[in-house]
Swiss-Prot record:
Note accompanying the cofactor annotation: Binds 2 [4Fe-4S] clusters. One cluster is coordinated with 3 cysteines and an exchangeable S-adenosyl-L-methionine.
Origin species: Pseudoalteromonas atlantica (strain T6c / ATCC BAA-1087)
Protein name as catalogued: Ribosomal protein uS12 methylthiotransferase RimO
Lineage: Bacteria, Pseudomonadati, Pseudomonadota, Gammaproteobacteria, Alteromonadales
Keywords of the record: 4Fe-4S, Cytoplasm, Iron, Iron-sulfur, Metal-binding, S-adenosyl-L-methionine, Transferase
Xref: InterPro entries: Elp3/MiaA/NifB-like_rSAM (IPR006638), Methylthiotransferase (IPR005839), Methylthiotransferase_CS (IPR020612), Methylthiotransferase_N (IPR013848), Methylthiotransferase_N_sf (IPR038135), NA-bd_OB-fold (IPR012340), Ribosomal_uS12_MeSTrfase_RimO (IPR005840), rSAM (IPR007197)
Domain Radical SAM core: 161-399
PROSITE patterns: MTTASE_N, MTTASE_RADICAL, RADICAL_SAM, TRAM
């Protein structure tokens, strides 16, 4: 869970994500049309926050960073798991206590009764991706300010809550799958793909604004276009098929790092491998396998349960030897036996995945998995989690040790008095490892440099910049 911050002067986040607004600073602005905004949850929710803020800034509202400076606070909530629900409710309560005027939106907004039971004094509640409804509620409770309509109050790319050099590109909304542990479809609906021309227009604007890395996100990236039967769209006057491969081809021609998230292991992924092997798309796949036991995958109702996953991974690595695979897994799912768990550990040994996250199963209100028999005890969940992480740390450490002495490109994220911190193609922001370059204080965020790896641990690399290498600022 991250909580992002909006700086109205530079439309970027702080380097360490924090809450948008703080409670202890006195108001220094005139009153009337000032919005405080707190964005909780995943990158897809962050994109929704960017869209709402862009519309409000276009209409002349100011966005401020403290509770005291705000005339009204919007909280964009997360409701994916129970801990996220509690964080959302706590944040709403904090905003009410410090400001008093709060509009709630986002995934938890579909549970209006639950919110009002805890916080009856919120001004309004909307569900996820209800952009116009949120703005209309702001109009109702905070009159639209007078402003010069000919003055451009936002950049061409809109308000962005990420650093200037990378941006999330959401290509669709919703999901057609019905995994038993997940309630996303009940909150965000079935798959709805954005028009491909609209996506490519946005990507081009981001490129023109200096963005170096596009992080392609959705609930199911590999299903992009399925809902519209991959119909033909248009971009720059030319026909373009609405599909993941065609989208990746066009994005890869723009000269940015293109990183794919939330991909399912369908056969269609094979078609993207040549783009990764040729350097048009980063050789990085974020694929949530979730488990390796066929029986548990069936209980989860995972769409790829019947796929020959290991065969696909081997084929992908043959087509693109540099491929980095990130995945997430659940341990302690209802009915998981020691035999099932051992299948998962064996899969880690066989698959040799580069980046892995693991979660202990917990019930989520409204999820069908709650009703499955044979729950796993908390003690067993913890024990399996520790065994899983120990296994994966050994794999990750060995893989990173083999990179010592190699030359890599590094996208710089942060520079301080000790040096620079960046990421390689193998590292997505916030969730993967980092590359440390000690002493390189003259670099800037957004620079792309060449470096030689000198040291590694289980997750991160230490490198030195290659002399006389070109910077891409």
């Amino acid at each position: 869970m991250t909580v992002e911050t909006f700086n109205p002067k530079q439309t970027t986040t702080l380097e360490t994500p924090i809450k948008t607004i703080e409670a202890d600073k006195p108001s220094t602005l005139s009153t009337g049309s000032r919005i405080g905004f707190v964005s909780l949850g995943c990158p897809k929710n962050l994109v929704d926050s960017e869209r709402i803020l862009t519309q409000l800034r276009t209409e002349g509202y100011d966005v401020v960073n403290t509770y005291n400076d705000a005339d009204l606070v919007i909280v964009n909530t997360c409701g994916f798991i129970d801990t996220a629900v509690q964080e959302s409710l706590d944040t709403i309560g904090e905003a009410l206590a410090e400001n008093g005027k709060v509009i709630v939106t986002g995934c938890l907004g579909i549970k209006e009764d639950e919110i009002r039971e805890v916080h009856p004094n919120v001004l309004a509640i909307t569900g996820p991706h209800a952009y116009e409804e949120v703005v209309n509620q702001v109009h109702e409770h905070l009159p639209q300010p007078s402003y010069n309509p000919y003055m451009n109050l936002v950049p061409d790319i809109g308000v962005k809550l990420t650093p200037r050099h990378y941006a999330y590109l959401k290509i669709s909304e919703g999901c057609n799958h019905r995994c038993t542990f997940c309630i996303i479809p009940s909150m965000r609906g079935d798959l709805v793909s954005r028009p491909i021309g609209e996506i490519l227009d946005e990507a081009q604007r981001l490129k023109n604004a200096g963005v170096k890395e596009l992080l392609v996100i959705s609930q199911d990236t590999s299903a992009y276009g399925v809902d519209v039967k991959n119909k033909m769209g248009f971009w720059n006057g030319m026909p373009v098929k609405t599909g993941m491969t065609e989208l990746c081809e066009k994005l890869g021609e723009m000269g940015m790092w293109v990183r794919l998230h939330y991909v399912y292991p369908y056969p269609s992924v094979d078609k993207v491998m040549p783009l990764m092997a040729s350097g048009k798309v980063l050789p990085y796949l974020d694929i949530p396998f979730q488990h390796a036991s066929p029986r548990i995958l069936k209980l989860m109702k995972r769409p790829a349960a019947a796929e020959r996953t290991m065969e696909r991974i081997k084929k992908w690595r043959e087509l693109c030897p540099e491929l980095v695979i990130r995945s997430t897994f659940i341990v302690g799912f209802p009915g998981e036996t020691e035999e099932d768990f051992q299948m998962l550990l064996d899969f880690l040994d066989d698959a040799q995945l580069e980046r892995v996250g693991c979660f202990k199963y917990s019930d989520v209100e409204g999820a069908k998995a709650n009703d499955l028999p044979d729950p796993v005890s908390e003690e067993v969940k913890q024990e399996r989690f520790e065994r899983f992480m120990q296994k994966q740390q050994q794999i990750s450490s060995a893989k990173l040790q083999r990179r010592i002495g190699s030359t890599i490109q590094v996208l710089i994220d942060e520079v301080d008095e000790e040096g620079a911190i960046g990421r390689s193609f193998a590292d997505a922001p916030e969730i993967d490892g980092l590359v440390y370059l000690n002493g390189d204080v003259e670099l800037k965020p957004g620079d792309i440099i060449t470096a030689t790896v000198e040291h590694a641990d289980e997750y991160d690399l230490w490198a030195s910049r290659t002399i006389n290498c070109d910077l891409s600022a």
